[in-house]
């Protein structure tokens, strides 16, 4: 069974790269930035992996950063743990209020989303695997056929007992009408956002697609992810093992920096366009 996990599996391989490059925000191109650009320009089958850091500029806080949701309120992490969600009605009620008040509903795609959507037009972006549940890639113009929402989407609701699935707004209307822990109208089961919580199985088809694209890519570009949640983080060493270049762009160090060919650290809305500007022309 494939579970979302905060821990690294004991048998997961790690491949150390002999060259680890870092950069900070600068007005002048660095050798590391130039190298990343040249690799992207030469690559023909690029896998992009995005995380919460890409959406912070859109007003959606990340989880583990210095101002992350779970950093500021560790108890909030219980809302994303399937064990608590299934066993505690109060957790479910809090989770529904959190969904109702989510900044996702007012958020617009940021520059990073838009740059990646434009980059897709080059025909060299094979697959975009996102850990984000906000749907901003599609709103920015990324093709839904190329986007794998590996942790699901907050924009839909699914029953945990049957096949019932509807847009989130349908259930939020029931919340506005006074329901606190809405049940499935078809079977009476527990409803939940169509996202993957800790301890919950990933969609096997989505993970299989992501792994296949990883083995097929010649460059993996990771953007805005701490690369600490498995099995998604495990895509990086898989790509490395098959010979792909690894470029990481993030606002802080990640768990996979030692595996990368280049690690570019800085404001994503400045660094990412710098990396992709020539490649999108």
Q: PLM features: what roles do these ranges have?
A:
Residues 2-281:
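Conserved catalytic core of sirtuin-type NAD+-dependent deacylases
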């Amino acid at each position: 069974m494939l579970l979302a996990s905060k821990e690294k599996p004991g048998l997961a391989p790690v491949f150390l790269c002999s060259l680890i490059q870092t950069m900070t925000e600068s007005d002048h191109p660095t050798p590391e930035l130039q190298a990343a650009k040249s690799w992207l320009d030469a690559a023909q089958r690029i896998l992009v992996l995005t995380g919460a850091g890409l959406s912070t500029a859109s007003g959606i806080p990340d989880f583990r950063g210095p101002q992350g949701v779970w950093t500021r309120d560790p108890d909030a992490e219980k809302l994303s743990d399937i064990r608590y969600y299934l066993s505690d009605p109060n957790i479910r009620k809090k989770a529904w209020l959190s969904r109702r008040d989510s900044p996702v509903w007012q958020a617009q795609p940021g520059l990073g989303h838009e740059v990646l959507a434009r980059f897709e037009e080059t025909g060299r972006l094979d697959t975009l695997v996102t850990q984000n549940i906000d749907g901003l890639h599609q709103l920015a113009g990324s093709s839904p056929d190329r986007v794998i929402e590996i942790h699901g989407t907050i924009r839909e609701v699914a029953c945990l007992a049957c096949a019932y699935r509807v847009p989130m707004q349908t259930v939020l209307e029931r919340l506005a009408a006074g329901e606190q822990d809405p049940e499935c109208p078809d079977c009476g089961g527990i409803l939940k956002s169509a996202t993957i919580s800790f301890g919950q199985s990933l969609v096997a088809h989505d993970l299989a697609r992501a792994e296949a694209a990883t083995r097929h890519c010649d460059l993996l570009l990771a953007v805005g992810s701490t690369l600490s949640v498995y099995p998604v983080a495990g895509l990086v060493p898989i790509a490395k093992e098959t010979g792909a270049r690894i470029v990481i762009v993030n606002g802080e160090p990640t768990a996979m920096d030692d595996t990368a060919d280049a690690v570019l650290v800085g404001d994503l809305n400045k660094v990412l366009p710098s990396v992709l500007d020539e490649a999108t022309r």
